[in-house]
Amino acid sequence: MSRKEVSFMEDKVFVSIFATYMDLWVEDRKAHGFQCKSAIGNLRQIDMYIASNPPQGSIDQSYYEGWLDSVRVPEASTKAVYSKAATFRQFLKFLKALGINDFIPRLPRCKDNFFVPYIFSHEEIQAIFQAIDSTAIRSEFNRTSLMSMPVLFRLLYSTGMRVGEAVSICNKDVDFQHHVILIEESKNRHQRICPINKSLQEVLQGYIRYRNMLPTKKVSLPDSPLLVNRCGHSLNINTVERWFRESLRKAGIPYRGHFAGPRIHDLRHTACVHAMIKLVGEGMDLYCSLPVLSKFLGHLDAYSTERYLRLTQEVYPDIINKVNLSLPEIKAIVERTSKTEHWHEDN
């Protein structure tokens, strides 16, 4: 290899046969507001392994396990191995969404990073809303994102969408006539429609009227972001997280740390569990509710949604035990999901 070729290889972040898709995945993550430094580091290690050990065809269970063995070196912590495996899994889900590769692995066990999503009670949800509603802007000239937080928190809880999806919504994606929001920037790269109820629609319309008074002409354009800071710029997820933690503090809900939560993503988990309880309360068979919830959350398959059944049993055991836990299908799902990987941001 010539010196020029070596220099070219060193300048490229990814060099394997999946380099183009890795670049696209990183761009997609950044577009959703995620910090990618750690993920890029993990992906480069995966890329080097693939470059040195090209798969014979697609990436399957056997190939993945070979890679996993290569990172399970004595000096590697279980947390580090889990982080790399999570990145690989996210990338493989991206490939599946593109129709490139079908295999999606389960994550390894990680004692250092175990957590169960925090499910807020209905009272805690109302306390969070009241806390963010009562938070005042400290300076008239502040570039704060606070003006969007009350509607964002309600949007996440009402629709169950991911925060990355919410901050990517454009004005043109909101259809008040049909009471829906179109999600173009889905995590799984699948377009989906989120229904909005009457109360959320009223909140959104009130926010838009206030937002359109900002001294910027672009804020109301169809392709401009729906949720903005006072300068008319789109929201940063890290800023959203900070406002959420502040709301937890004001609501008297202890923040126990990043992996212990509660996190902004737990509004999505809570939305699903509360929706499941509502469907059961309205008489829907619990087993039949899973496909409905899968569509609601934008999951590619029902497997990810099944884990909410176990979580609902843990949080609301009386309700679940009273209805359908006696059914063999429900028992099988609860037992299966209790033995699988830990919760992750994929959900």
Predicted regions and their residues:
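Conserved catalytic core of the tyrosine transesterase superfamily
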Residues: 2-347
